Amino acid sequence: ISKMNKLFTFIMLWMMSCLPTLAQAPMDGGVWKDNTGKHINAHGGNIFNYKGTYYWYGESRSQDGKPYSSLGVSCFTSKDLKKWTNHGLVLPVSNEPGSDIEGGCIIERPKVLYNQKTRKFVMWFHLELKGRGYGAARYGVATSDTPFGPFKFVRSGRVNPGIYPIGFSKPDTTDLKHQLLFPELKEWWTPAWRKQIERGMFWMRDFQGGQMSRDMTIFIDDDGKAYHIYSSEENLTLQIAQLTDD
């Protein structure tokens, strides 16, 4: 058999092996509805399997047409990734004035994982404070004893205030602080500006108060260590931070 015929046979066999999988695709198109017949309202989240059940957490956006209007974090469950049961809000925004998650805040990219050590479900998310647009650039953390919540808000903040990243030379910080004073570096996208951004100019700017954290995810490695991966430095870079055991 020629090499071409062998290649053709391999491709055909591979395509045939995919047919059952394609036929069982979870989503057939159109509006994806939950068990109540409503459009699934769970944006920018994650799905993870716990004891044979899939849990889908996502942003619950209001239906009033207002952009970025957040109701909190919703939860849906499924056994087959096709039919989803709505469990409502597991982390609603707060009615308490001054709370970091007061109604009017922006909650995005919620990610939930199970901590084997503490036996807690831990939620991380991107948080913007009420009335500040996208200026806060914080992470938020909440925990629960069950995957259905309710999740209790723990805290929010910037990442790693006052902490140097691995491999960063402390003497570089003096020069980077100096660069922040140059008027010509106030203009974005110039070659000189790009060079200083790559060196960490915005990282140095946010050193004391902590690094910006916007779009994000959580990754658990095979050794059980968990990492927070997030866009930072005005969305110009990705940073990664190892989480503590809890």
Task: Give the residues covered by each predicted segment.
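Carbohydrate-active catalytic/glycan-binding domains of CAZyme proteins
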Residues: 22-246
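Bacterial Sec-dependent N-terminal signal peptides
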Residues: 1-25
